[in-house]
């Protein structure tokens, strides 16, 4: 039997996305449901518009994949829609486990996720395909303004717009995860 139920992970505030899947799914299968997961279902607005919001741990938890597999079995899930970048690699790595249950996981290949999760790899990929990116800046001989961001960052955390030497602190200079790049003004 074909499984039409959908699971949207880390639903959070994704009310529009959840409603869009519910509305579209209803046109094809009136009995199908859209489930959501979140670490804090009571604080996840999308959970209130889904058919059910199920509490799960952070995607880095040892039991995360097993819990999702269990949810897929119990709720007859046919499609998983991840919504945060940190879930992509773990789901890509475990794609076959889901496919064995007849579940499609909407993620690219592990190799492509690895390119996207590391901004150094992303830059090399883009340049190899003829797409210009901001130039790297030597942090010990900087040209201002510059922009520093973690190569593996997410959610705009630990971003630094640096306009003058005194803003380039030792903490920033010594952070091994930061990439230093020319600042591109939005007016350009």
What are these regions (language model features)?
Residues 12-14, 85-87, 139-140, 165, ...:
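Short beta->alpha connector loops
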Residues 42-50, 139-144, 170-173:
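Short loop/helix-cap segments at secondary-structure boundaries that form the rim of catalytic
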Residues 84, 150, 182:
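Short secondary-structure boundary segments
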Residues 163-188:
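Phosphate-binding site of ATP-dependent enzymes
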Residues 41, 152, 185:
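Short, glycine/acidic-enriched loop or turn micro-motifs at the edges of active sites
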Residues 1-106:
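ATP-binding N-terminal substructure of ATP-dependent carboxylate-amine bond-forming enzymes
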Residues 99-165:
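A conserved helix-loop-beta module that forms one wall/lid of the active-site cleft
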